[in-house]
């Protein structure tokens, strides 16, 4: 696709857009000045870019009908394996549909990408296949991942296996629902505000948001570079540890992972937690929307840790209450600029840029923007409003405040091995009807991140484990650890899991 020299009319229009007053002679001179840089673009078109590596042979699979998609959790079903032997031999894994699998359609929950088929595997997919895992399919997710509930996916509502009238959570709702329904033992999710932990909590499964920079997101569609995470969801703590072992570590592309420090996650499963100290985060229990019954289930689970030799005491981190405000300043403008205006791949980062995804996203933005969910429209318009009127000031300030938020948690974690709180202050909400008012559809998609989103900003690992039922719906306990200390969280999670059937707590 050669880059054409703009006409003098186009250059005049470009200048006017920036408030430039250009004479006819200046416009003509700028047209000539364009020729040198555009010659470089011409050469770029000729050069052959590297790819992510060879792709194993496979069938593209199929889109399942209602009979084999009871909860709407599948977008596409496959049976991809290489015959390799490793830590995931015999395991079936669902892949969140914001992660590329070569030859398999990908929507990322959005009409914008309908019909797109990537030609490459994301790093995490390659690692799963090399470890002997079988890719069972793509798990449905929320529209461009801009929802913490499960009613904005373009392929249909994703339902909670514990009560199909209730949300599975989001944005990795399909991943958690498939694990909860027993269709796969493990799945991959993404997390920018709680999108691994929310559905894991609401569906009663185990979900880990790793330390920022531990797991490469190469080949995954981003939202905002500074809060993007990819991590495991499993039916057990062992499933989470097993999958994390395979996907963690630098991949040569994602520069966020250069400093990644991996641990022996499988060995951590057998290490008793006796002697560890945990801080019970006061602010995590005190939101206006906190359900006392949820708080009680979480405190009972914490008591079971005491029986395993873990010391606990209450701790206060006042910054936790301002964390969601810092997160909002980062994610809203960041997503609008990087994802929506960056055509699904963003810019100014060191990493792999999937050109085919970028082109597909640009086509969708040009032809199907009115088909996106209300949450996507909100992010697009609000981000642009802040950009035009406040010139990125609040995004920049939020990025600076990130340091203070991180330090506040780190100060508490100097004394404690982990911080504990409810994952979500309440159980899964009812799925709004298709004709729900716009405000209801948006509010129920975005009202649950009070405890989760701050740790996307601070980058600390956060592990949710099921710890009880309230009116038949699961409750999650979230444990937050030091950077790259996922092993301690696995030790604590194993102790809670071993304490007995969480459904009877």
Show the residue positions of the predicted features.
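Amidase signature
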Residues: 1-88, 246-453, 457, 484, ...
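Short, well-ordered beta-strand elements within core beta-sheets of diverse protein domains
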Residues: 19-21, 75-76, 92-94, 112-117, ...
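Gly/Ser-rich catalytic/binding loops embedded in alpha/beta enzyme cores
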Residues: 21-192, 274, 299, 303, ...
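Flexible loop/turn segments at secondary-structure boundaries
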Residues: 102, 142-145, 194-197, 229, ...
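Short glycine-enriched, charge-decorated loop/helix-capping segments at active-site entrances
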Residues: 108-114, 435-440, 479
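Short glycine/serine-rich loop segments
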Residues: 121-122, 126-251, 456-469, 473-476
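Short low-complexity, flexible loop/linker segments enriched in glycine and/or proline
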Residues: 150-154, 201-204, 326-332, 435-437, ...
């Amino acid at each position: 696709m050669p880059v054409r020299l703009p006409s003098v009319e186009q250059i005049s229009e470009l200048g006017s857009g920036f408030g430039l007053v250009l004479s006819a002679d200046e416009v003509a001179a700028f047209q000539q000045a364009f020729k040198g840089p555009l010659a470089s673009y011409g050469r770029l078109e000729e050069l052959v870019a590297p790819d992510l590596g060879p792709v194993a042979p496979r069938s593209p699979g199929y889109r399942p009908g209602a009979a084999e998609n009871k909860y709407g959790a599948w977008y596409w079903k496959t049976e991809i394996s290489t015959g390799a032997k490793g830590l995931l031999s015999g395991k079936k894994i669902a892949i969140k549909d914001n992660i590329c699998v070569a030859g398999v359609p990908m929507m990322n929950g959005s009409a914008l990408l309908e019909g797109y088929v990537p030609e490459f595997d994301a790093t995490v997919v390659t690692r799963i296949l090399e470890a002997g895992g079988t890719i069972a399919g793509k798990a449905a997710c929320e529209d461009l991942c801009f929802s913490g509930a499960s009613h904005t996916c373009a392929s249909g509502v994703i339902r909670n296996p514990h009560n199909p009238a209730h949300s599975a959570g989001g944005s990795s709702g399909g991943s958690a629902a498939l694990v909860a329904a027993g269709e796969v033992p493990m799945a991959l999710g993404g997390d920018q505000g709680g999108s691994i932990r929310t559905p894991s909590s609401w569906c009663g499964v185990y979900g880990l948001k790793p330390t920022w920079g531990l797991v490469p997101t190469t080949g995954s569609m981003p939202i905002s570079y500074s809060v993007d995470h990819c991590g495991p969801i499993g039916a057990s703590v062992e499933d989470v540890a097993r999958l994390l072992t395979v996907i963690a570590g630098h991949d040569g592309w994602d520069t966020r992972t250069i400093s990644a420090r991996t641990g022996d996650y499988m060995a951590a499963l057998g290490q008793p937690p006796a002697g560890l100290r945990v801080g019970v985060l006061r602010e995590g229990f005190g939101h206006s929307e906190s359900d006392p019954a949820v708080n009680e289930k979480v405190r009972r689970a914490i008591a079971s840790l005491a029986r395993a030799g873990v010391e606990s005491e209450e701790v206060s981190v006042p910054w936790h209450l301002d964390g969601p405000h810092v997160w909002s300043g980062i994610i809203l403008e960041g997503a609008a600029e990087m994802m929506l205006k960056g055509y699904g791949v963003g810019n100014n980062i060191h990493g792999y840029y999937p050109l085919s995804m970028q082109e597909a996203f640009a086509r969708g933005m040009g032809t199907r923007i009115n088909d996106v969910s209300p949450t996507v429209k909100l992010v697009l318009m609000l981000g642009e409003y802040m950009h035009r009127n406040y010139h990125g000031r609040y995004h920049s300030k939020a990025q600076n405040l990130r340091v203070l938020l991180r330090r506040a948690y780190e100060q508490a974690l100097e004394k404690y091995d982990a911080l504990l709180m409810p994952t979500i202050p309440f159980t899964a909400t009812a799925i709004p009807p298709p004709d729900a008012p716009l405000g209801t559809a948006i509010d129920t998609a975005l009202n649950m991140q009070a405890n989760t989103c701050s740790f996307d900003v601070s980058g600390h690992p956060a592990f949710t484990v099921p710890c009880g039922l309230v009116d038949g719906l699961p409750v999650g306990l979230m444990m937050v650890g030091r950077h790259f200390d996922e092993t301690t969280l696995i030790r604590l999670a194993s102790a809670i899991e071993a304490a007995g059937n969480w459904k009877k707590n």
